[in-house]
Amino acid sequence: DSGDAKFLDIAELSLFNNSLAGINLHGDRFFYVNPLEADGVRRFNHGNGGRAKWFGCACCPPNISRLILQVPGYMYAYSKDRVYLTLYGGSQTTIPLEGTRVKLEQTSAYPFDGKVRLMVQPENGSKFSVCMRIPTWARSDEFVPGGLYPYKQPKQAEVELSVNGQKTDFKMEKGFAVIKRDWKPGDVVELNIPMPVRFVDCIPEVSENIGKTAVTRGPLVYCAEEVDNAGPVQRLYLGDTNEAQAKVANISSGV
């Protein structure tokens, strides 16, 4: 009810980095807890060093499956004269606003690409606001709201927003870029959120994390696994953090 996008920022990071890791690609093995690191030996997961097939109290497996199926319902929100894009990804929906119904069609490869294309199709020309969430990681010097996880590098580029190919002015309200105008069927909004590789530290008050950094790109936090590296990954050392680049890898099962 607060209308503050910071809660959606946390939800997005949890969906991409926590929830998806709780279930394997085949959908038949699960984490009961959420480890930030694991050596494959210590049996942290109800007697298992990795994901387990089932649990004595098996509330987690059906809940994670249910959550994944509920995600489409979290992608949009609305009030009488506003449409909110709360999560990004290919989708379409119809929103009932005061005086009109609006069909929205979103095209994007997010979270791997920061370009979002939104076609706005009101049943009749109408004035209302389209509100695009601009994540904390894209508009500030910290990865998530709260003051715990600052970036090593400063922000490198600004978010760009256009309507029908023309750069448009917008105002920020609680983490949303608000575009208020008379909309016509076929209007197209394009959002471009830069996604450089960035490194995240933790404030020194969290002593356990001193000397550690997280590698991120957009909303994704990357994990180092032995299968992808030539040796143990418990102690990896980063060189010049300004030299990092992202490459697309062809992972198994079409991911």
PLM feature spans:
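C-terminal beta-rich recognition modules with glycine/proline-rich loops and embedded aromatic residues
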Residues: 9-17, 22-121, 139-163, 168, ...
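Extended extracellular/luminal ectodomain segments enriched in beta-structured repeat modules
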Residues: 123-130
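Active-site neighborhood of glycoside hydrolase catalytic domains
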Residues: 1-5
